[in-house]
Amino acid sequence: MNGSRALHLSAWLLLCLLCSAAVARDDSCETCRKLVDRFHKGLENTAKKNFGGGNTAWEEKTLSKYESSEIRLVEIIENLCDSSDFECNHMVEEHEEQIEKWWFKMKKKYPDLLKWFCIETIKVCCPPGTYGPDCLACLGGSERPCHGNGFCNGDGTRSGDGLCRCEAEYTGPFCLECADEYFSSERNDTYSLCTACNQACKTCDGPSNEDCKECKNGWIKDDGKCVDLNECASEESPCKDSQYCLNTEGSFLCKECDGSCLGCSGEGPENCKDCATGYVLLAEKCTDVDECDASEQVCSRENETCLNTAGSYKCTCSEGFEDKEGNCVKIMEAENTEVTDGEMGTSASDINISNTAHEDL
């Protein structure tokens, strides 16, 4: 039992290491591509520079031209990576000699730095249309992976399996077959053009609803065509009692009835099956009952006013009155209203206090 567990653990660890290595290779290629992009940016930024010592002609004659000088290379390398980018800095540190070799010896013969450095020298990337440790051709060929209808897994990297991930219109290992809802409008051994079927078709061999092999859900065959199925025409509505069914192309919507309705067959108060409480059928539509206009008073408290609302009414205290313990009582004005006297602003309360004090004396 222990031996079996150890074997399973070893296999699991090996699988993890292989996955980690594949991810690392993929990341290394991306890092190398970014590094090369930054190198080209550095070339642009330093294109019009010189030694800057004041005697440019002497310096270029004595120290070689700035364009291909070590000083320019150092300036470019110093700006290849952000300080926080560990992978980039590690790659530059590990392969700085190869970068220098390309700069001084190989640049004219191999002007494509990405190809020379990332693909052929440190071997972290592959040429376009190839994948994996040995840069094998993607399915469909390296010139046109997946026949131009998808993406090769691992394309241009030392990882992946080379399998095709097809675009929405295509399927099959080589992305040459048409997916559901598409038909082949052009096809040969190396090329396929898939075009969308009519909206009613699940599968088809042409552009119209007469060309459907199968209908989509929400559509049915009728006289050789796929036509919309009207779900709302069924005896039992697919919607709730408080909703009505609205047919759409290939489907339906459940929409809320008007507030005046108790069940409905469509939008608005004129399509009510019955009127909700507080509404009556008037001129073929459910209309609000104005309870406040009834001959019998509905608000019975003194100093109370009736306010009609949609489907109901409210009893509120009249203007100038407020509700206190179930009764509408008059709102009392503040008693301590100050009356000013002259510029000093003496109030009536001040005068009363003064008079009272005077009498006590």
Swiss-Prot record:
According to the entry, every stretch annotated as the EGF-like domain falls at 134-176, 288-329
Polar residues bias located where?
346-361
Q: Which organism is it from?
A: Xenopus laevis
Note the SUPFAM superfamilies from the entry: Growth factor receptor domain (SSF57184)
Query: What's an example GO cellular component term for this entry?
Result: extracellular region
Per the record, the domain of life is Eukaryota
- InterPro entries xrefs: DUF3456 (IPR021852), EGF-like_Ca-bd_dom (IPR001881), EGF-like_dom (IPR000742), EGF-type_Asp/Asn_hydroxyl_site (IPR000152), EGF_Ca-bd_CS (IPR018097), Furin_repeat (IPR006212), Growth_fac_rcpt_cys_sf (IPR009030), LE_dom (IPR002049)
Segments of this protein annotated with the region Disordered: 341-361
State which residue ranges cross the membrane: none
- Describe its function: Possible role in neuronal acetylcholine receptor transport.
Principal location class: secreted
Q: Which keywords label this protein?
A: Calcium, Disulfide bond, EGF-like domain, Endoplasmic reticulum, Glycoprotein, Repeat, Secreted, Signal
| Encoding gene per record | creld2-a
| Renumbered ranges of FU repeats | 191-238, 251-298
The positions making up the signal sequence are 1-24
Q: Where would I find glycosylation on this chain? A: 188, 303, 352
Q: Which family does it belong to?
A: Belongs to the CRELD family.
Q: What is this protein called?
A: Cysteine-rich with EGF-like domain protein 2-A
